[in-house]
């Protein structure tokens, strides 16, 4: 297939996008500084800034003193040139965040989904509330990105099934697009957490890593060569079903209910899932209301609580070693409420135990993404899409 010729229009589009991305990363620059960073002549840089200013994408945000002569104008990206919405959907809560083109989340609201049995209504109402809180119109939102538990078909972008959200099934993507009237992306929640970790967390320098989500349920986000790996059907990362030593084999997986996978009766989920973590805490004398609370107690409870941390680390290491001998990610990030509560104390223990079980021991660290990593990943995915549209050229 012949390459697209370097027409003046195409070259302008490339230069414009390069300049906008540079301004987002570096902050405001003068015309001369922009030329130095991009290699553009002063005349070309001036023409570029005039174009972007006319499109409402950049503006003068200040000035900088130089040598002789007047101060030079500083140009920055107009943050309000596009807004996006990121959402996390769960059976007990729905959180919506509004961000501008910089990716900064301005407003975050959480609403009761009432079981999330009406996906379109739930999403629309949550975004409407967030938009009003942000002081923008619903129509100002350019892209929506939604994180859900369960499997998303990588070929269609639609939900295949969500065990915790039975109303979220095939066809929901079209329904959301018809209602919202804008591009909508649905992604597995753990995959979005991995995107956040790659962009602003512990994996910013890694092109190959795995994020192990530890909460009530278990999940895995895999990044290979800088890209999410979803598998043929979107089931990559369903590590709750991973057969591991020390857990009964999940004999019911071959008999799923219509539209959903069965409850996990064994495997890694039984060895290290949330219910097991709370049961282990009870055995060690602590009645924990959540898996995260159990691990927080183990971290802060002194010598009497350390056996729980050691026990959990040993169980997690079995899964980590199994993952690493297949994928060899180099880095494993422990995320979710258990990973965050355990911090580096749990991560270091898991690393030591995993190193004894596999020939390619990984580095194991705790997540460094603050607050809601799934929401952060959803916003980042939406911003990337919005930038691609807004920066591409005049509509």
Outline where the language-model segments fall.
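ATP-binding/phosphotransfer module of carbohydrate and carboxylate kinases, centering on a glycine-rich
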Residues: 1-63, 67-140, 180, 247-395
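Phosphate-binding/catalytic loop of phosphoryl-transfer enzymes
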Residues: 87, 101, 143-262, 383-395
